[in-house]
Amino acid sequence: MAANKDKAGAAGAGDSMPASASAPSQDALAVPIYWAEAKRELMQRDRIMNKLIPQFGDLHLRGQPDPFTTLARSIVGQQVTPKAADLAWGKLLAVCPKLAPNQVIKLGAVQLSGCGLSKRKTEYILDLADHFKARRVHADLWSEMDDEAVIAELVRIRGITRWTAEMFLIFNLLRPNVLPLDDPGLIQGISQNYFSGEPVSRSDAREVAANWEPWRTVATWYLWRSLDPIAPPA
């Protein structure tokens, strides 16, 4: 699923932010403040990155500014093709253009299911909306919390896996040092670029990624790009 990440992925850009949520501290659509430094350091210390990064010029990670929408979009995209996820997401936005927790709860299970969502995904999105509405998540504090603390809070929500939480760290909070080891695109990118296409274990991936710290998000993004150079991953 990593190979279509900025394109449709973690969220739909441009949706308004619910009152219970907060945006990243910087403009999510601007160049992340650490990007230039990260590129420079990665190119200095990693021969693969030194060849890979220049191929993509000024392209960079584009964040998704609305926490609720980011997470809802990730749930919609779980275990389906990008095309099916885009279709269901489009139907959801058609019936709920201002995607916010209160509006989703008002829609209810029947209308959500009518957008092509499975019973389980419908339950997950309603539970997510309820968490935001009841303020059982601390979206206004996430920008100040460390990565593992944010992950620990998010995975308590039904339908949010560690991978989903890591995508949230990358695309909403723009954290610079996330290594999503459960992401097939990352593993495939390491395999193709560092191991000539040979199978790669998690321990292999960790060993390669140790050289990227504290910029593992940036290196991961460039490996996604190496697999899908036209559309940014989401």
Regions found by a protein language model. Give the residues of each.
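Short, contiguous, helix-prone interaction/anchoring segments in small proteins
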Residues: 66-70
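Alpha-helical ds-nucleic-acid-binding substructure associated with the helix-hairpin-helix region
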Residues: 29, 48, 52, 80-81, ...
